Amino acid sequence: QLGAVHQLGVQIPPTMITNDPEDVRRFAQSHARVIFKPVYGGAHTRDLGPAHLAPHRLELALQLAPITLQAYIPGTNVRSYVLGNAVYTAEIRSASLDFREDSHAVVLPMALPADVQEQCLAIARTLFLTWTAIDWRLTPWGEYVFLEANPSPMFLHFERQTGFPITQDLVHLLMQ
């Protein structure tokens, strides 16, 4: 995803996917703050801390599966749902690194700049996704940084908080 999206000219965070402990250490030293998550699966995003870099723990964890490391991007969580040619976007106010852990997260509808809305549609087309949820970080400097496009996103909570007609649009797409 990241490579294909980056080729569209969309900004992405510095990223490494690896199961080599030395690569993890070098990446951690190269960035002030690093987050990690599984390459595949729904496990939540975590901050990479000194305990994770302990040699035995790191080697044991990386024997099981590679991880995705990313430089932490300061800012606000933004999620855009793309359903065909419709794009619905909201800011997610949460104190948690991974908003899925925060039962008190507040979801507020927001307007995307036209160029970012076009990027959403281009990302969905490039990844062959008729419908998707795209996660962004909106930096304090006003830049949108792509994090991922989820091909099978949960949406009911989001729909209830925003009033966006996601279910209706999804049913319409499936009926076509």
Predicted regions and their residues:
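Conserved N-proximal alpha/beta basic substrate-recognition cap immediately N-terminal to
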Residues: Q1-I12
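Short acidic-hydrophobic, aromatic-tinged amphipathic segments that line or gate anion-handling sites
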Residues: P14-N19, G49
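Phosphate-binding site of ATP-dependent enzymes
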Residues: E22, Q29-I123
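Protein kinase-like catalytic core scaffold
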Residues: V34, Y88, T132, V145-L147
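PAS/PAS-like sensory domains
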Residues: I67, L129-T132
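C-terminal active-site "lid" helix and adjoining low-complexity regulatory extension at the edge
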Residues: A111, R125, L129, L138-Q176
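Hydrophobic residue at the +6 position relative to the catalytic HRD Asp in the kinase catalytic loop
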Residues: I134-W136
